């Protein structure tokens, strides 16, 4: 279910503070976060955010097309390696 338009998008406070601090200094550095549920807002455009996928932090450069999506969408947690091979030939 989508979030109500009356409510603001969810962004973790610590993440928002870090981005606003970098915007006032006009600096660009990698921001490390575990907050996959935070929504990407226009003030994040141009920053690189390292999003935790359960094992490591994956750096993601934020562009304007990502606004409105969640950070977790750009950091996959599962690496699909393909289905198991059908091993009927070795059984004969």
From Swiss-Prot:
GO BP: ribosomal small subunit assembly; translation
Span of the signal peptide: none
Annotated source species: Arabidopsis thaliana
Keyword annotations: Chloroplast, Plastid, Ribonucleoprotein, Ribosomal protein, RNA-binding, rRNA-binding
NCBIfam families: rpsS_bact (TIGR01050)
Coiled coil: none
Any one GO CC term of the record: mitochondrial small ribosomal subunit
Transmembrane segments: none
Family: Belongs to the universal ribosomal protein uS19 family.
Cellular localisation: Plastid, Chloroplast
PROSITE patterns xrefs: RIBOSOMAL_S19
InterPro entries tied to this protein: Ribosomal_uS19, Ribosomal_uS19_bac-type, Ribosomal_uS19_CS, Ribosomal_uS19_SF
One Pfam family cited in the UniProt record for this chain: Ribosomal_S19
Name the UniProt record assigns to this protein: Small ribosomal subunit protein uS19c
Stored HAMAP family: Ribosomal_uS19 (MF_00531)
PANTHER family in alphabetical order: RIBOSOMAL PROTEIN S19P FAMILY MEMBER, SMALL RIBOSOMAL SUBUNIT PROTEIN US19M
Plastid recorded as keyword: yes
Role noted for this protein: Protein S19 forms a complex with S13 that binds strongly to the 16S ribosomal RNA.
A molecular function GO annotation: structural constituent of ribosome
